Structures are given as structure tokens and as C-alpha cells.
A protein has these predicted regions:
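Loop/turn-to-beta-strand initiation segments
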Residues: 82-86
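A structural signal for short, well-ordered beta-strand segments and their strand-loop junctions
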Residues: 37-39, 87, 113-115
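Conserved GTP-binding G-domain of TRAFAC-class P-loop NTPases and closely related GTPase folds
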Residues: 2-4, 8, 107-235
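Conserved glycine(s) of the Walker
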Residues: 14
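Acidic, metal-coordinating catalytic cores used for nucleic-acid/nucleotide bond scission
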Residues: 87-101
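Conserved substrate/cofactor phosphate-moiety recognition/catalytic segment
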Residues: 17-81, 118-125
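Short, surface-exposed basic-aromatic patches at helix termini and helix-loop junctions that form
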Residues: 24-28, 99-113
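Residues that form ligand- and interface-recognition hot spots within folded domains
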Residues: 9, 22, 90-92, 116-119
Length: 235
């Protein structure tokens, strides 16, 4: 049996724990199985269990994960009777990236399963709540066919649900213009319009971020005045 499990979920949704559960189930059924777990956080945690985040570390983790994926698929193709499980448990917010991974493993003959996590546990790495909620919304807006929604053991609180509602309502409101700063890229836009842009941290100056409209904005023609102003903006 050769299987690929894609786990999607915001920070603190229980992805890592669920991945361990699925790995144990597979190992119990196929005792000689090779388990390959791909997750950026695992690659950014040292041998002493210390998590070290940086833009450079993320890039290295992604490259390491991609290389491990390629190598494991190659082993699977060369050994079709070998029991292998690949678990990919990053947040996996982009549906296009998920589809690419699924197409890739199917070409190598792997069976696939997709799971979406909905828990709201405290995330281990101090990600701001707004960023967590934005990731949750983005996942809702970027669904993948045949994904299995895992019932939450610890669902969102009433307060979190209200914040999610406010963030979603933001998209229905006209843009506000900050007269003092002479910009459409307001604090409110940065807080609630995050699905429309990416913020990439500088490797040399990690406190700075470069803003750029999301690729989906281009494909869906969802440009607004803030996004037109934003390209290449550094904050």
C-alpha cells in the first residue's frame, strides 16, 4: 500500500496530532511501512525541541520538504510493492498547491486522502489570533474536492466566531481612505483583507514585510485601490 495523506488546517487546528494518529494506524496495519512526515514546523525544530522561525528557515524547510517528497515518490515508483505513507501537514491554504501535490502523487501511483481540521487549540508558536482566523477563512474559501472535514474536539469560541464574521463582512464594505496617511492600505485593510495579499518577511530585516497582491486576485480580477497601491509596498 502506497498512500499520500494531505492535511489542511489553520495554526492550532490539530494537524500534527492527527498526522501522528494516521501514521500509527498505517503502521499498525503495515508493520514494515515507511512513514514520511512532511511539515515545515518539524524541519524548523532542532534536536533539543527548540523551534526557530525565520524567513530563511521557512525557505529551507520548504525546499527540504519538496526534496523529501520527490525522493520518496521516486522510491515508491521503483518499489511498487513497498508500503509507504507520506503525510503532508502544513497549513496547505492554497487549493492550487494542494491540487498540484495530489496530481503529483497520483502520477506515482499513490492513493490519496485529504483531511480538513477545525480545532481551535492554542497554537504552539505564538501566531497572532488574527492571522489564525485569516488562515481559517482562507481555507474555507479555497476548498479542495473530496476533502474530509474532521469534527472539532475543541471548536471555535463564540468570540472567535464573531471575529470571523466581522472579517468576512469586511469584504462586503467599500474601501476606506486614510486622509492623514493618504493611503487605502489602512490598518483595517491589513487586518481584514489578508486573503487579497501576501506579506513576505525580509530575510535581512525580519521586522519588515513586503506586500504584494495574491495570485488569486490576478486570476479572479479582484483588484481594488489598496491592492493597486500595495505592490512592492514595505511595512
Amino acid at each position: 500500500m502506497q498512500k499520500f495523506i494531505l492535511i489542511r488546517g489553520h495554526q492550532g487546528s490539530g494537524k500534527s496530532t492527527f498526522a501522528e494518529q494516521k501514521a500509527a494506524e498505517f503502521k499498525a496495519k503495515y508493520r514494515d511501512a515507511e512513514i514520511v512526515h512532511i511539515e515545515n514546523d518539524l524541519f524548523m525544530t532542532d534536536e533539543n525541541g527548540v523551534y526557530r522561525w525565520s524567513g530563511e528557515a521557512v525557505d529551507k524547510a520548504q525546499k527540504r520538504g519538496n526534496a523529501l517528497m520527490t525522493e520518496t515518490l521516486k522510491i515508491g515508483r521503483q518499489n511498487p510493492n513497498r508500503n509507504i505513507l507520506i503525510i503532508h501537514s502544513n497549513t496547505n491554504q492554497k487549493a492550487s498547491r494542494c491540487r498540484h501535490l495530489l496530481d503529483l502523487v497520483k502520477k506515482s501511483g499513490f492513493e490519496t486522502e485529504i483531511y480538513r481540521m477545525h480545532n481551535f487549540y492554542p497554537n504552539l508558536h505564538g501566531v497572532k489570533e488574527h492571522d489564525v482566523l485569516a488562515a481559517y477563512i482562507k481555507l474555507n474559501q479555497n476548498r479542495v474536492a473530496n476533502e474530509i472535514h474532521v469534527e472539532a474536539m475543541q471548536p471555535a469560541s463564540a468570540e472567535q466566531l464573531e471575529k470571523i464574521k466581522q472579517m468576512q463582512a469586511f469584504e462586503q464594505q467599500p474601501l476606506s481612505f486614510d486622509e492623514a496617511q493618504q493611503t487605502f492600505v489602512t490598518e483595517n485593510y491589513l487586518q481584514h483583507g489578508s486573503r487579497n495579499f501576501t506579506a513576505k518577511a525580509s530575510k535581512r530585516y525580519p521586522e519588515l514585510r513586503v506586500l504584494k497582491y495574491a495570485r488569486s486576485v490576478f486570476y479572479d480580477n479582484r483588484f481594488d485601490d489598496a491592492l493597486l497601491e500595495m505592490r512592492g509596498l514595505i511595512i
